[in-house]
Amino acid sequence: MIYEKISRERVNGFLHAVGRTIQNGNNEEILLTGWGLGNWLNPEGYMWKSGEVSFSRGREAEKSIRELAGEEYAQKFWKQFRANYITKKDIEKMAEFGYNSVRIPINWRLFMEETPGEIIWKDEGFTLLDHCIQWCKECKLYAWIDLHAAPGGQTGSNIDDSEDDLPRLFMNDDYYTKGLALWRKLANRYKDEWIVGGYDLLNEPIMPNDG
């Protein structure tokens, strides 16, 4: 019974909730098992062995590499990193192992410029996410899009790529507006993709302590 519920044969159609269960497009219960693609579209310091160099969060890793090797090299490095850190072969291997879902943590800065007061889209993040979702469809694993690093940060720690360990998403109107715009864009882009099982709107959000 359990084996049937975790089988990739149940990766079929839009997921929906029925009481305390999750069901597929055939109204069959499915138990989700899977991997998280941490450090790919949102670099996290603890996943790097950077020694004394500060890689505590994505923006600091980017700064360290720029200072060490220059802007041109840094741009090439991150492009190659994202092209190779996760590939279709990784998704195929997860399917081979019998899992039925993949969580994809993302950083807003791959999708939007940081320009204050403006909404300027970037192609890189959407292209990478499109590819991963297509791999998931081909390999029959539900994809879960996780906004791990929201505009300004939603947790106030290194995991959300915040600038100063404050959840400024909740403290700054511009960041809040960017966050809403990003989710509208993502929802509209993938609304017809049944393989997108769901969305983690904000990973580990915490309101600022005003006291």
Model-flagged regions — what are they?
Residues 6, 10, 21, 29-32, ...:
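Active-site mouth of glycoside hydrolases
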